[in-house]
Each structure stands twice: as structure tokens, then as C-alpha cells.
């Protein structure tokens, strides 16, 4: 009880993504650029998909909500990190840390599910195009979206209370750039069995199952593409699928490292780098890879510019 009362009073200190040295200004500038580019790219995607009738399709509906999640996701973590660097301190209250942990888990869980279900959407579009209007109807799209948000919310409501109710009797310095659950666990003392059990169940449900759906869908897509008679169409489809798989592998791979590998494989530097992949880099790559390279999206952008 004393440890919990002290934590509520003192809060925590975030050590940040990088230390203050002669290169820190460069890294700060890079992260600033990535953050603003991600916000602009996702904002453009949301705007175009909402105003252009040509993009009012199930696929772009899901992509617009992926952009919404990415915008919320990166906004939960990066602004606080940048302000901490400028102010030269990383203090965060217990309530703010709990809120950040809750929000990032919810957004991350929602994105895990949405990416998995979007891979299924692409599988149906390429492998069963004649049945696409039936299998991916607007009703199904809303169900996909609702299940993604429900999965993310369930992740937050399960893990956040358990994580933040642990007694933090070791140190109040978090060697990380945000309040990530596995890092918080290292500061805790006492019995962690309940947390580890819930974490294992959540990892199977939130990571391994969606990643298996993604892998199976894209494997089937690649087989179908390989059987295409048109060499140009096959080349274009392979290029699109490979870029999508790169983003998905980066996102899921980094998260699998963070949440499934034993503690003996982890170091603070590795944890920060892998976390940066799926919290900072992925929200920028998603709109670039999934959407802005798409001819329909670029056509919509040109039509908007022409009307201005």
C-alpha cells in the first residue's frame, strides 16, 4: 500500500528515446519530421476518402479508419516525448501514465485486428472478385470496424488495470519514451503471474491470430498472382503485395518481439528501437504504402487540387 501511495504522489520519470548528446538534436528533428508527415499523410487520406465519391468503397472505408487509428496512435505518444526533450525533463504523473498506457493499448489492438481483416479484404478482392460484393458488403465493413475497436478496447480494459495496480517498489525511472506495459512490469515487484497469464492470452488473441490471417491471406494472394497470365499485371500485383507485407511484417514483428519474447532477450535499447518501429514509423508508412501510391487516391488528389 505504501508503494502504491508513493507512486500516486511521485509519478514516474521517462528517460526518453535517446540521450542528450551532440546527435540528439538530429534525432529530435527526424522524429518531428516523421510525426508531422504522418499527421499530414493520414489527414490527407481521411479527407480524400470522405469527399471523393470514387473512393466510397469498402476498401477505402477501411483505409480511412486505419488512418484515423494511426493519427490517434502516434498522437498519444510522440507529442509528449518531443515536449519532454525540449523541456529537459520526462516527469509524468501516475494518472497520465495510466491514460497513455490505456490509449496506446487500445489503438494498437484495434490496428492489429484491422490490418488482419484488411488482408482478408484484399484476399477476397483478388482471389474471389465475383463474390466480393457479397463477402465484403457495407454491413461486413461496419462489423470489421466494430470488432477491431472492440478488440482494442478489450485489450486496454484487461491489461491496463493489472499493469498499473502492481506495486512499483523498484525505481520510478522508466527507461523508455512512453508508458509501455512490458517496461512498466520491470519496475514492479510482487507476484506478476496474473499479469503474465493475461498478457499471454492477449498476445495470442491480438497478435498471433491476426498475423496468421495476414500470412494466410497474402500467401493465397501470391499464389493467385503467380498464376496470372499477364506478366505486367503479375509484376504490379507482386510489387503491391510485397510493400503491404513489408509494413505488416514491420508492425507485427516489432510487437511480437516486445510482447512475446522472454525478458532475457530484452535490453532497454532494443525495446526502444522496436517500439519506435510500430509507434512512430508505421503510422507514416501505412498511408504511404497502402494509399498514396494508389492511382485512385492520386486521381482524387488531382481532382481536389484542380477544383482549388
Curated annotation (Swiss-Prot):
Subcellular location, record wording: Cell membrane
GO MF terms held by the record: G protein-coupled receptor activity; olfactory receptor activity
Cysteines paired by S-S bonds: 97-179
Coiled-coil portions: none
PROSITE patterns associated with the record: G_PROTEIN_RECEP_F1_1 (PS00237), G_PROTEIN_RECEP_F1_2 (PS50262)
Keywords attached to this entry: Cell membrane, Disulfide bond, G-protein coupled receptor, Glycoprotein, Membrane, Olfaction, Receptor, Sensory transduction, Transducer, Transmembrane, Transmembrane helix
Physiological role: Odorant receptor.
Family: Belongs to the G-protein coupled receptor 1 family.
Protein name: Olfactory receptor 2T6
Species assigned in the record: Homo sapiens
